[in-house]
């Protein structure tokens, strides 16, 4: 009877298919080689629990997925599982989530922004629902500019900063909202300009605001903008180097950050190695505080980040230095690390939502794996290191990192053009976790490309192999046929590849000779008259009598005197 019950359904209708959620999530677990937990942390925990041999045998073959998740989760980072987002052809310089964590955006040096919908994402084969490329809509007036920074407001407006002088605002669907104005590059006084006159380097939204944002640029200014005022900025703050006059010399402002505890205060980093603090609405337009020689001059400070209480500032420079500053006593940094290499593009560092950790990506050294360092926020000691394999010959590096507190997921950008989102099944909610728990879609029989015949291939269309069989590929059937259709359309435009024959005559052209007077516009009247000249001479119809009475025509003779007298007498001239 047990065998009969297994084969015969106990109810009518279509049976719902059940899936093992743990098995679905296990597909995206990170291997144990991609983690390196600090040994000091392990030894201290093993002494507290002498009965547990988990940490002492972490390198053994009995290491399973649950232990993997426990190790990295105990550190405080939801990084036991990952989903990779491919698509960019160059370094991913910036990544960001929207406020609710339902949308994910990546920007790259390939000049494009990829928009990902995490609610409808296929975890095994993710594709962006939109790719923003400004040259697609305005190729004549817009050049090729890499994306330097993306930032989402509380109303999910995307602030996109390219390596030109105009900030751009998109909505959450990737549609253009507004392009802000640029300044007059021939005006030397930056206070009189209405926008940046040089490349923008960094920008961010004011905390808990969807109307005010800040940008910095190579024109030695920091500018505050209002989304409702697109023709000019609200305020301009000009960095004046010591020993120079206003407008005579310019030094780039490389990064900026708002103070969450004091929303009207912000900090800027300058190429001379200093960090300056400003106040919005100040009449003097001068910094209220300055940290000189925070980093080496002419190296650039790639990142500034405040703690939530506003007492600590994190700075990272291209001199491979990572420093934490106590703003209550800024004469000397609290701690620093100079052994973490800064990537050439991107290279930011952030505080965790608990303010206890710092995440900083770095460049691989003597290996093909890019490291992400998890540091203690105060001591800057390494608590864990996460490694990511490089899928290309480019030097592996983690170039961008962001953390969404609401869904508790971490996004990364790498030098090989891929982006990653880290999550934990127990600690994370929604986002890519829902995509990982979603079962794969049932495939149609035609999705098996090895047994599918492309109908258009019978006529020798492009994109197919011999005998009408579809080429072997790892793409889905719909994606393959879409690409094949694009190739066929491109081939049709080439007369040689498409083997176009010479165009024949139309039906009207064949019957035009039968229509009287159909070709009068194309005839020469002089040529038509001369055609009858010989006939008129041999057989004249109207002057035949003159051939007998006057065979030789006799014309009246005209002398020069008659011509001159006729010219002198205006009465003899014919009136027109």
From Swiss-Prot:
Stated name of the protein: Uncharacterized WD repeat-containing protein C343.17c
Matches recorded under PROSITE patterns: WD_REPEATS_2 (PS50082), WD_REPEATS_REGION (PS50294)
GO biological process: double-strand break repair via homologous recombination
Sequence ranges of Low complexity compositional bias: 49-58
Keywords: Repeat, WD repeat
Region entry Disordered, spans: 41-78, 547-576
Coiled-coil positions: none
WD repeat coordinates: 87-126, 195-235, 248-288, 296-335, 393-433
């Amino acid at each position: 009877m047990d065998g009969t019950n297994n084969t015969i359904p106990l109810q009518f209708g279509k049976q719902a298919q059940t899936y093992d959620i743990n098995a679905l999530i296990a597909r995206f677990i990170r291997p144990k080689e991609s983690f390196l937990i600090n040994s000091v942390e392990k030894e201290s925990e093993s002494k507290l629990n002498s009965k547990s041999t988990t940490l002492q045998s972490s390198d053994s073959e009995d290491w399973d997925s649950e232990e993997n998740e426990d190790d990295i989760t105990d550190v405080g980072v939801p990084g036991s599982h990952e989903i990779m987002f491919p698509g960019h052809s160059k370094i991913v310089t910036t990544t960001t989530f929207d406020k609710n964590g339902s949308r994910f955006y990546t920007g790259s040096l390939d000049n494009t922004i990829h928009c990902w919908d995490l609610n409808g994402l296929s975890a095994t084969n993710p594709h962006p629902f939109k790719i923003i490329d400004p040259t697609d809509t305005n190729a004549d007036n817009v050049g090729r500019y890499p994306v330097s920074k993306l930032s989402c407001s509380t109303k999910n407006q995307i602030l996109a900063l390219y390596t030109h002088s105009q900030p751009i605002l998109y909505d959450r669907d990737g549609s253009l909202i507004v392009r802000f104005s640029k300044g007059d590059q021939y005006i030397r006084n930056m206070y009189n300009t209405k926008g940046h006159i040089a490349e923008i380097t960094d920008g961010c939204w004011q905390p808990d605001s969807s109307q005010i944002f800040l940008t910095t640029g190579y024109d030695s200014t920091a500018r505050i903008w209002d989304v409702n005022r697109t023709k000019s900025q609200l305020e301009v703050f000009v960095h004046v180097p010591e020993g120079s006059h206003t407008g005579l010399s310019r030094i780039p402002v490389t990064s900026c950050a708002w103070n969450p505890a004091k929303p009207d205060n912000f900090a800027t980093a300058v190429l001379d190695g200093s960090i300056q603090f400003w106040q919005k609405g100040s009449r003097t337009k001068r910094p209220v505080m300055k940290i000189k020689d925070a980093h080496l001059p002419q190296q650039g400070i790639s990142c500034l980040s405040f703690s939530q209480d506003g007492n600590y500032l994190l700075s990272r420079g291209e001199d491979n230095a990572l420093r934490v500053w106590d703003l209550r006593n800024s004469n000397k940094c609290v701690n620093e690390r100079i052994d973490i290499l800064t990537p050439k593009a991107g290279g930011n560092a952030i505080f965790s939502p608990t303010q206890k950790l710092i995440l900083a990506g770095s460049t691989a050294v003597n290996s093909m794996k890019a490291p992400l360092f998890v540091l203690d926020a105060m001591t800057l000691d390494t608590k864990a290191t996460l490694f990511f394999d490089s899928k290309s010959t480019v030097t592996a590096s983690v170039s961008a990192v962001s953390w969404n507190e609401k869904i508790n997921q971490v996004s990364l950008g790498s030098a090989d053009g891929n982006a990653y989102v880290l999550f934990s099944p127990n600690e994370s909610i929604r986002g890519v976790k829902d995509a990982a728990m979603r079962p794969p879609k049932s495939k149609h029989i035609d999705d098996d490309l090895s047994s599918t015949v492309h109908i258009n291939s019978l006529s020798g269309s492009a994109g197919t192999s011999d005998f009408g069989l579809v080429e072997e590929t790892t793409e889905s059937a719909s994606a393959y046929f879409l690409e094949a259709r694009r190739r066929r359309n491109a081939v049709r435009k080439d007369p040689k590849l498409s083997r176009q024959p010479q165009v024949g005559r139309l039906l009207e052209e064949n019957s035009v000779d039968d229509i009287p007077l159909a070709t009068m516009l194309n005839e020469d009247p002089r040529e038509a008259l001369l055609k009858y000249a010989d006939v008129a001479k041999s057989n004249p119809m109207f002057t035949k009598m003159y051939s007998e009475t006057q065979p030789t025509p006799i014309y009246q003779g005209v002398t020069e005197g008659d011509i001159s007298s006729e010219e002198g007498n205006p009465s003899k001239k014919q009136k027109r």
